[in-house]
Amino acid sequence: MSVQVEREGVVLALSHRSGEGRPLLIVPGVMADAASWQGVVDALCTTRPVYVLNRRGRRPSGPLGDGYSVRTEIEDLCRVLDALGTAEDGGALDLFGWSYGGLIALEAAGRHAGIHSLTLYEPVVRPFGLQALDALRRADEAGDLDRAVEIVNRDVSGFSAEYVAQLRRSPAWQALRPLAAPLAQELTALNDHPADLTGYGDLPMPVTLLLGGDNEGVPPYGEPLARIAAAMPRARVRVMPGQGHLAHVQDPGTLARYIVEALDWARQQGAHACPR
């Protein structure tokens, strides 16, 4: 089932698994869409409604548009939260964000009152992937999606040439190509965004930070999470042994269990709301 929300003429589409109780909204990062997260949705042992946002640049949502920035994404997410809060009888939602989607969710949590809890899986903040930006922009200008997929895996995520070669031979490569189209603009927006780490510690809702054990203390994903965790002393950090940055693809069942555990913990903390 799908749901559509509109903001300033741009359609924002979400997948929707129906249920009862407090809704969960999932915000994917770059190189991912709602379909990429379906394995996690299917594995979630909960009866609650689950929504997954197809951010701008992912069909059937609209394009990034002129003047695209992280603020664009934040305002999109706040509009979606407004719409889902109305659809779900005005109750607060539990919000989950991964990677770039984690940054967007984190920023929205400081601006929207309808968030009951926040769970972030390896959110990223600037500086991030700067060494790959020029190459990504050249690939974007050339319309070379294959090259963009290669760059993000090799030069941003740090995967081996062998891994990328295997990925290129797999059916997943064709699904990744269109997801690479907005990548240069998204990475530019991320590095242009002055995230206020000191302000994150003031968020009143329960916060869980999820970290793949393989990334603990190392770039490119462990370091941003460590910085965010240091700025949020009340947040709970959960390390997932044997996982990296792609548990939603490589081990969706395990990631789903950690998400449900975070939601259960948040419920035990009691209801909280973020001031507007």
Regions found by a protein language model. Give the residues of each.
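Catalytic histidine-centered segment of alpha/beta-hydrolase-like enzymes
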Residues: 240-253
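Active-site loop/oxyanion-hole signature of alpha/beta-hydrolase fold enzymes
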Residues: 39-42, 51-96, 257
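Glycine-rich His-Gly loop
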Residues: 26-30, 99, 212
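Conserved serine/cysteine hydrolase catalytic core
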Residues: 174-231, 236-239
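Conserved HGGG/HGGXW glycine-rich cap/lid loop of the alpha/beta-hydrolase fold
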Residues: 6-66, 259
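Helix-rich cap/lid subdomain of alpha/beta-hydrolase
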Residues: 123-172, 179-180, 184-191
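Conserved hydrolase catalytic core segment
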Residues: 91-127
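Active-site loop/turn elements of alpha/beta-hydrolase fold enzymes
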Residues: 55-57, 123, 242
